[in-house]
Swiss-Prot record:
A cellular component annotation (GO) from this entry: centrosome
Function, in words: Component of the tectonic-like complex, a complex localized at the transition zone of primary cilia and acting as a barrier that prevents diffusion of transmembrane proteins between the cilia and plasma membranes.
Ranges where the C2 B9-type domain occurs: 2-118
PROSITE patterns the UniProt entry points to: C2_B9
InterPro entries per UniProt: C2_B9-type_dom
Keywords: Cell projection, Cilium, Cilium biogenesis/degradation, Cytoplasm, Cytoskeleton
GO molecular function, one term: gamma-tubulin binding
Name of the protein: B9 domain-containing protein 2
Protein species of origin: Xenopus laevis (African clawed frog)
Family listed: Belongs to the B9D family.
Disulfide bonds: none
Keyword hit for Zinc-finger: no
């Protein structure tokens, strides 16, 4: 079977209204993909930058897949959270990106968004915190339902990923 190695890191995030951020991430693939090694979900530590607009995580990503075809190419979905001084967590944004299908090292920016909610929810969020969240993470990377949501743009997540393709020609899988 053809193999794909995804190696890299979630560098950090910038452009968010508050510091003290962490990221939950996961990788979604189609049914023809088999994980050979690594983990497909995780969470970074909380970073509270003192003098910088960017929270740094340097969280490693290392996965090895076998596949029979390109259908269901991996998608990375991200959730950026803010942790306040009392240890309460508030969702700051969702994001997803397709893992590049070309071999090599890629520097990526993934813009984030969050559901806007009704005006009552927005007022409640200003005073109490929290805010609307998606019921299912599949809406982040899924089909057209995501485009019906009213959202507001948040910051962006910085990533560096290296993609290594192996045995694609041998098994007749064309990636270009």
């Amino acid at each position: 079977m053809a193999e794909v190695h995804i190696i890299g890191q979630i560098i950090g995030a910038s452009g968010f209204p508050q510091h003290s951020l962490f990221c939950k991430w996961g990788l979604h693939t189609g049914g023809a993909w088999k994980l050979l090694s690594g983990v497909v979900e995780g969470q970074t530590q909380v970073d509270h930058p003192q003098n910088d607009d960017m929270a740094f995580w340097s969280h490693p990503i290392d996965m090895h897949f076998a596949t029979k075809g390109l259908q269901g190419w991996p998608k990375l979905h991200l959730q950026v959270w803010h942790q306040d001084t009392f240890g309460r967590n508030e969702l700051y944004g969702y994001s997803f990106l397709h893992i590049p299908s070309t071999p090599g090292t890629h520097t990526l920016l993934s813009p984030t968004w969050r559901p806007l909610g009704t005006w009552q929810e927005q007022i409640c969020q200003m005073f109490v915190g929290g805010g609307p969240q998606l019921k299912s993470a599949s809406l982040i990377y899924g089909g057209s339902d995501r485009y019906r949501l009213q959202t507001v743009a948040m910051g962006q997540v910085h990533l560096e990923l290296t993609v290594i393709l192996r045995n694609f020609e041998r098994y007749g899988v064309e990636s270009s």
